[in-house]
């Protein structure tokens, strides 16, 4: 490739190495600052043209090598110039090779992921007019010597078929290790990649470091003895008395006679409880069977026994059930056909029955008061007032000539059908 400026004056050596700064390899004596700026601009022009030619040869949509990318990455480019032909005394460029270190995640033979940072071949181009003349091998070999690497330790970024044939022909690199990215590695790549040092090498390094560093190590600080582990107590190390008290049974099993005097020694409180109120002792637990047995064996009250013995009508509940005739029963017996027509005597009879029940309740309360007085004093109180008139005998009403009480009428009403249809 030819350029309008003097390439021999810009690159005095056959192979020139440029870094990301793209500076001239050597300063000529007496070169001013504007001249140095012009030289750097010429180098940038050469790099851009080489990148375009490489992209065209590899059928890439855009060049992957340019002066701007070189300045933004820590890559190295090797430029090979033609020293035999001197057209118009300016020289020519044959090709270039761009390399750089990249952090990769690659797979080994066992398909295990490995994080490595090898030297990668990023771009390689030789002009079509001078190919198969050994210029590519010369440039590649110079790079290997400069970087001190072996061909099987390299990773190639998207190599072209021509580059793979070149590596197979000159360096016997044929078998590749399959990868999931665009890089290609060959067998032997993991032979010297991040191998951990052996114990002997590690011991040798420590001994060398001790000899190189004459400063004695600081004495080890004595640590306090480790305290023995004990039982973990809830919330604090103090005893909690209320946690040891039995749970109070539900009502009525917890009903017990209260003590007349408070306990002589109340349970102590924990110091960590603060101003929380004291919990009194729980009542003793009474089994359910003993409670039921005591209820069955409990004798009735004397007043209740006397009332049951003197009442001819049975229990008080029975008297309440049979007291008078409800208005509903009277209405039912009056309005249904099986009892005949409407009889107004039923209403009067019901009123008389209700008055009779009220009189019986008054007599019963008076008798209970008399029994209580007898139980308390042992003497029968004297009656100072006028004698109470006796209640008239209970009246009843007849149905079909038979005397029937309210209980029988109620049973009859419950057993029959109340539906009018």
UniProtKB/Swiss-Prot annotation:
Polar residues bias locations: 342-351
Enzyme class, UniProt record, top EC level: transferase
GO molecular function: acetyltransferase activity; L-lysine N-acetyltransferase activity, acting on acetyl phosphate as donor; tubulin N-acetyltransferase activity
Keyword DNA damage among record annotations: no
Tissues/organs with expression: Widely expressed with highest levels in neuronal tissues. In the brain, expressed in the cortex, cerebellum and hippocampus, including the pyramidal layers in CA1 and CA3, as well as the granular cell layers in the lateral blade (suprapyramidal portion) and the medial blade (infrapyramidal portion) of the dentate gyrus. In testis, mainly expressed in the internal cell layers of seminiferous tubules, where spermatocytes and spermatids are located.
Entry-annotated residues carrying Phosphoserine: 272, 276, 315
Catalytic reactions on record: L-lysyl-[alpha-tubulin] + acetyl-CoA = N(6)-acetyl-L-lysyl-[alpha-tubulin] + CoA + H(+)
Chain positions of site Crucial for catalytic activity: 58
InterPro entries: Atat, GNAT_ATAT
Start-end of Low complexity biased regions: 209-221
S-S bridge residues: none
Feature: compositional bias, Basic and acidic residues: 226-235, 352-372, 412-421
Residue positions, PTM Omega-N-methylarginine: 323
Region (Required for AP2A2-binding): 308-387
Domain of life according to the entry: Eukaryota
Chain residue ranges for the region called Disordered: 196-235, 252-284, 342-421
A Pfam family the protein falls into: Acetyltransf_16
Localisation: Cytoplasm; Membrane, Clathrin-coated pit; Cell junction, Focal adhesion; Cell projection, Axon
EC number per UniProt: 2.3.1.108
Swiss-Prot/TrEMBL keywords: Acetylation, Acyltransferase, Cell junction, Cell projection, Coated pit, Cytoplasm, Cytoskeleton, Membrane, Methylation, Phosphoprotein, Transferase
Subunit note: Component of the BBSome complex. Interacts with AP2 alpha-adaptins, including AP2A2, but not with AP1 gamma-adaptin (AP1G1/AP1G2); this interaction is required for efficient alpha-tubulin acetylation, hence clathrin-coated pits are sites of microtubule acetylation.
Similarity-based family: Belongs to the acetyltransferase ATAT1 family.
Protein name: Alpha-tubulin N-acetyltransferase 1
Source species taxonomy: Eukaryota, Metazoa, Chordata, Craniata, Vertebrata
Gene from which this protein is expressed: Atat1
